[in-house]
Amino acid sequence: IIRRELSINSQDIFEINGPLDLTFLMKMYGLEGFELFKAPRYVPQPVPALMNEDDIFTNIRKGDILLHHPYQSFDPVVGFVRSAARDPEVLAIKQTLYRVSGNSPIIAALAEAADNGKQVSVLVELKARFDEENNINWAKMLEKAGCHVIYGLVGLKTHSKITLVVRMEEDGIRRYVHLGTGNYNDSTAKLYTDCGILTCNPQIGEDATAVFNMLSGYSEPLAWNKLSVAPLWLRGRFLRMIRRETEHARAGRPAHIMAKMNSLCDKEIITALYEASCAGVKVEFTDDFNFVTAKDVEGYLNKGYGSYIGQRLDSVDLRKVESV
């Protein structure tokens, strides 16, 4: 069928034994001499807020820094961890790792931090699909370097990307945090679309500390300041926001929901979105891969769904819920 629909000659088809390793396509794309068939090469740009001579901690204290990869360089994220490893005022570094590159500067910086006498705690997710063996090896290396390695909560996969740096300053201890939608992988950061933020907001720092305490098994937070953490708290917050807009629409007030995500398969949230749309809420969202359609949620119709195919894997998840 594929040959017929694409008008492919039988001489262009090659049969092989076993599954095809598609990673060879990356090497093929890198061959020289075929620039006519390639998209223009994009060079990640520097982050304006960091284009001065101040150290990264000084820049973060000036205000939160939003990062948008690969359009902006991933270097500030690597630099954040590396600076923390070498800064004599830094007391501790805590980080979650899901996937990293083969020769990871992040891993090297964490090992350097431990060697410099800092308290380094790293959650390495051993259930990261296709990277189980790599992550076991990274965990062993980090433990050998003196890092405290943890493996998360039983029955759950830790997919969050968080770095917490605890630093002693003139006015006391300050917590610096990086939150991101993408892995701490300097290679894929050049290909995948992700967002991140560097901040020293005290409430986010407190939440990040609570996340690591929870992942370490020390305690479970009673409440959160800014963060919403799955699987216990995130869905409930989304449902409350969606239902708030539904009530605004039913009362005749403006109501609007915009969302962009990597995948939407939660039927409870999907049902709430359909209910909001039927109540008059303007619902617009884009899903990159998977979407449970109206046929899976009986009684509702889709009122504003779109998907797209682009050059890069887009794993940014955004929600905007607004009303008057």
PLM feature spans:
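Anionic-ligand anchoring segments at beta-strand to alpha-helix junctions in alpha/beta enzyme folds, i.e.
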Residues: 285
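Short glycine/threonine-rich loop-to-helix capping motif typified by GTGT followed
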Residues: 265-274
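N-terminal localization/anchoring segments of enzymes in phospholipid and broader phosphate metabolism
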Residues: 1-257, 275, 279, 288-324
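Cofactor-pocket helix-loop regions in the catalytic cores of large enzyme subunits
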Residues: 262
